[in-house]
């Protein structure tokens, strides 16, 4: 009760204090306290010094100061009086002038230069500027000479409660875990007040909650927000809106206030166990489904979110634990049941599983709420499907000897239809795996037989694929790999491992090893190779060489004596019989060539006679000489024939089947000849119509331009063409009517559109069958011979 009375009295006195501050009568204080009055002592004494300069000589300081105050935001009809300047040197004769300078002098503060009164002519705001520093000085009214040194003073702006609190960082967001205990700190907020925190209670703030109760509370002075209720459940309500108020003047009436909002979100904790939506699930699956296929999904719902809702799924019981598995889908938060092993409808038609869902992240604070897991039953029904045949073995390994008879049985494969309605099976070989068709199979019983002979030395293994097909449904097929190993038999005789050539020194010693040889066998006996070496029966008593078997299955050839002479015999041939240990044993004879060479004293071969080179075909030197002689003789005959052919005179008589157009005829033409198509053409000038290259056809007979004379009779067929041309040339040269060589001669123009076309051999590109020369008979007797020639060529061609 006393505290409430004190607050009431404070609320009543606050307006009175503000009014007392603003009264002008209190701004100017009485001279006894010298609050806002400046006074001076004795008058200014003036004295003269050298150079007639006057200086001020003050007996005592005349200014007395206190700070001046002015209330902010004051807006009256008249400028507010801040204070008054006064000096003791002012007797009231109005001969002293007061000057004010500094912050705001002349713009904010104005002084009466006679009375020294200072007024604020503008509205002041403490939040913009809290104090002003000015300089005061008293000068002579007439001379403006200072009577006292300048002095500084401060005018402070007194604060009033004109600013409301503000939340600069609002609105706010905060989180707090659900199920938190009472008084759990959520966050804290801060408001600011621009008023003076030192003077009065204008900046003293008190916080309160306007909205958000009874869930949250706030401490009035620190603004810390706490939970006001325990065990708030996120699943019931996840988000809360809290309205917070900050009020100045200590929260009393008349104070200014500001508000902000705080959004509080409850974060999730694992306080809920998973729960299956149903206790029994039914799924069906065909028996031929591929391993790893998803059969179905089960899901346990959890009201929590994030990692608190994550659950792991397991199969904990049932008769199909070996055939099925369950995996957790973290994205969908469910369990996926997949096939682990093949199913067989004929063996078992249904399975029962018991699955469990358990939270992964457990919060021990809520373990008392029970186990965070749940179980459900899954019923899986297997559906019948038409399955492909099943072989009795996934792979087959067969063995056969390489000398096995054709059509002999190598082995057998078996397969069955696993369905209830069993279908007969037919077998076949995938020929892509048996391109050479070395094997066959019985389509009914699956027996594999040999089709072509085998050779282990060519291929030891044969891998084929057998196909089993249902007769009732050809789309149901199965394949099985069959590996056939070819077993070895002794069918190859041993022989030298390489071609050997031994060298024997003439000065060699008896018992000296000439050469060491080894043998090889393409067969592969189980116990390895063991070779027997011997000489031919007729070479057993060989006087020159002997053999010795070594422990490493090789053979050494030794000399029996010394004194070999390459002049007497240069090469020795030693046949060696090599036998294997097979059943039956096989043998072969290999010949070792031994050359006698000249050697140094230390046994180094220096020279050996070279054996005459023998052609691979076995021809002797005499046969070679005979062959070369025959070739040279043939070449001589050919050269003689060509030479005689060149000197032979061939007749120039035109044969009946010869075409005269195939002969090149020379003309003595003016100008550039036939090739000169750009030369001067008098016929073109005489016929302007032919300028464009198209002349009208004129069928006229040639006119005689010379005196009549007796000519020779037409030349009969078969006459010599050379003689005929020479006669005609002689007549032309001796013709007195012929024009001179330097005159312009006019020839019959045969241009484009002429029936005859060009008579040049170079332009005769068409075949004889495409041309008709019957019109030549209409040109007169002088062209009769030409017509006969062409007519003869055409008739001969037809015959």
Curated annotation (Swiss-Prot):
Membrane topology: Single-pass type I membrane protein
Transmembrane regions listed in the UniProt entry: 622-642
Molecular function (Gene Ontology), one example: identical protein binding
Cell location: Cell membrane
Residues in the Extracellular compartment per record: 62-621
Domain of life of the native organism: Eukaryota
Residues of the Cadherin domain: 62-167, 168-276, 277-391, 392-494, 495-616
Residue runs in coiled coils: none
GO cellular component annotations of the record: adherens junction; axon terminus; catenin complex; glutamatergic synapse; synaptic cleft; synaptic membrane
Propeptide stretches in the record: 30-61
Record has S-adenosyl-L-methionine as a keyword: no
Keyword flag Nucleotide-binding: no
Segment forming the signal sequence: 1-29
All ranges on the Cytoplasmic side of the membrane: 643-799
Glycosylation site positions: 188, 463, 473, 544
Pfam families per UniProt: CADH_Y-type_LIR, Cadherin
Functional description taken from the UniProt entry: Cadherins are calcium-dependent cell adhesion proteins. They preferentially interact with themselves in a homophilic manner in connecting cells; cadherins may thus contribute to the sorting of heterogeneous cell types.
PANTHER family for this protein: CADHERIN-23 (PTHR24027), CADHERIN-8 (PTHR24027:SF273)
Domain comment in the entry: Three calcium ions are usually bound at the interface of each cadherin domain and rigidify the connections, imparting a strong curvature to the full-length ectodomain.
Protein's UniProt name: Cadherin-8
Native species: Rattus norvegicus (Rat)
